[in-house]
Design a protein with these regions (language model features):
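C-terminal motif of bacterial Sec signal peptides marking the signal peptidase cleavage site
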Residues: 12-14
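Bacterial signal peptide processing site
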Residues: 16-18
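Post-signal peptide N-terminal segment of mature Sec-exported envelope proteins
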Residues: 22-40
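Short beta-strand elements that form the blades of beta-propeller/WD-repeat-like
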Residues: 36-49, 128-135
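Mature extracytoplasmic domains of secretory-pathway proteins
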Residues: 52-54, 59-126
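Short, exposed beta-strand-loop hairpins at the edges of beta-sheets
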Residues: 133-159
Length: 166
């Protein structure tokens, strides 16, 4: 009987509502990633019990809601200031840097590991002047995705340190 009472208490404790996440922020912006005049939507959010342990998510959807690009990582990798300025940070992060693949560095200027593509594919994408979206992937690094209209998908193009972007 004593064990039954303990089991009942444990079961009740397991059913107790859990505390909601304390680092939940979101920002949304429109972007013209897939083509000029497109109504693509960038949504960024954080999810976690606190901002030190939160995950940051970057998602791009076409106007019809079709998901075309995502990136996620630890929030502290992007922003280490804590919860006070997280919403303001997300507002800035949602402002995608939109350009074209012709502005990407030439193959010979890439460091090993900056792209997962082979040389022929990288140079073909660069020469085709496709839409390109870049956003932060850490406090000092950004990731760039290209849009392939023939396939209707976005793909990882390359990553670069911020000091090499300007």
């Amino acid at each position: 009987m004593k064990y039954a009472a303990i089991l009942v208490l444990l079961a009740l404790a397991a059913c107790a509502p859990r505390q909601a996440a304390q680092c939940e922020y979101m920002a949304t912006r429109n972007a013209e990633f897939t083509r000029p005049g497109a109504h693509d939507v960038v949504t960024v959010r954080t999810i976690g019990p606190n901002c030190e342990e939160a995950i940051a998510l970057y998602a791009v959807r076409e106007a019809d809601g079709h998901l075309i690009w995502t990136w996620s990582g630890p929030l502290r990798q992007l922003y280490a200031e804590g919860g006070e300025g997280a919403q303001a940070f997300l507002q800035q992060w949602a402002l995608a840097n939109l350009t074209t693949t012709s502005t990407a560095p030439e193959w010979r200027r890439l460091a090993p590991g900056q792209t997962t593509l082979d040389r022929l594919t990288y140079e073909d994408i660069r020469a085709r002047n496709l839409p390109m979206l870049c956003h932060l992937s850490s406090a000092a690094r950004e990731v760039c995705a290209f849009w392939e209209p023939a396939a209707g998908v976005a793909g990882l193009y390359f990553e670069r340190n911020l000091e090499t972007t300007r």
